[in-house]
Amino acid sequence: MDRALSTFPGDDDETNERNINHREKTSGEHGHYEDKLLDLSEEEPNMIKIKNDIKKIINERYSNYISIDDDEISDILKDSFISNEEMQIKDFVLRLLVLEKLFQTSVKECNSLKNIIKRLENHIETIRKNMIVLTKKVDFQTGRSTTL
């Protein structure tokens, strides 16, 4: 037996239909999809220099906060906005405004989380103090301690 038996009748037919549909979507000997991904090995020397500059800036200024690898930098550089020959001022300003709004929202959320964490720390400290008082009361009532 070179294949597993199906649990329900008709499962084998569905599997065969899926294989036929898969073959229709693919092409070539190895069954690769027709849509080709961008080949990163054929990058322009200018892009390699830009990638190295980005890495250098991040390592010098932001190494404590973020780490970035080549794939992430390549994804950033593949943006159609960057690859355009002519830059539209309106598009540039709109992107800056969106980034500014995202940054403001992130800072606001960070401050909100900071306040929540501070409140939780205060609650935990109150619970800890009350647990110590309760332990002393139990010890006094059971006769293990003579002082409160």
Swiss-Prot record:
Keyword Membrane listed: yes
Where can this protein be found?
Virion membrane
One Pfam family assigned to this protein is: Vac_Fusion
* Disordered: annotated segments: 1-34
**Predominant location of this chain?**
virion
Which keywords describe this protein according to UniProt? Membrane, Virion
Q: Which residues cross the membrane?
A: none
GO cellular component, alphabetical, reads: membrane; viral envelope; virion membrane
InterPro entries (UniProt xref): Chordopox_Fusion/A27
This protein is called what? Putative fusion protein
Could you tell me which species this protein originates from?
A: Sheeppox virus (strain KS-1)
